[in-house]
Amino acid sequence: AFPICYEIIKNYNKGKPKEEHFKGIYGTELTLVDDSADITFRAKDDDLRNTTYVVFDTETTGFNAGGKDQMIEIGAVKIANGEIIDRFDDFINPGRPLPQKIVDLTCITDDDLAGADNEANVTKRFLEWAEGLPMVAHNAKFDMSFVDMACKKYGLPEFSNTVIDTL
């Protein structure tokens, strides 16, 4: 393994100034962390230790927010001082049967959605409930793509909250 590591480092350093050279420390195991990845977007100066924030997730009919897919559930909690102070959980009726792969993935069925409101109304209620608070989600870009598309599709105000991605 050392000869392979040596060759990789030698090729990486080729043509770089000496102060930018990478040096291997043989006999150690290191983990490289990509600290350049953006985990926050639409950022404002929010300190989650001192503010109320929302943790949320969406379930959808598929993976294409800009295509035929849409949200089928928005679930969220408001957190203040480390405690849940409020909850939001609404199913959304997509007006068509769910694909079986989505039923298998989410355990949400057509029967669950039968009496649910439409995407426009649920999204509007969610925006009002979130009231501009910072938002936290795992794989937030996916969830926000559906929220943003719903806002655009139904003429709702643009969602401009700070968003933090835990992925």
Locate predicted features.
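Conserved non-catalytic scaffold segment of RNase H-like nuclease domains
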Residues: R49-S160
